[in-house]
Amino acid sequence: MQSTSILRRLTVADAMHEGIVTCSPSDDLDAVTAAMAEHSIHCVVAIDEGPPGADDDRLWGVVSDVELMRGLDSPLDLDAGNIAELDTAAVAPEATLEHAARTMASRRVAHLVVVDRGRPVGVLSTLDVVRAVAAVRALR
């Protein structure tokens, strides 16, 4: 089966990581560094928690390992909000992996935040897409 055929059949929900690791825009870079190291991940999703008591976490941005390295190298005292990519590439869980792969390629990003009704619910990486294709091919 061709890879493009596999990508058309599978959805983002089939391959994404659920249970995202998040931070607040006000978190210091030490906290973001610790979260990435603890979970062995390449990005942390920055969320706007909304008013106290509200269950309304909204995507604010993404701090990737690349932005983190730049921030750690800065002489300034920065927080996650200072280095997060605000024009975050996002995708819906029901989108095809083909759509997600094209979005990653056109945006030149290695991760997409999976958003359902405005709320971040997962992360899809290029490696997740590769693993999904490999798993389907292994079943042949």
Where are these regions (language model features)?
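Tandem CBS (Cystathionine beta-synthase) repeat/Bateman regulatory domains
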Residues: 1-140
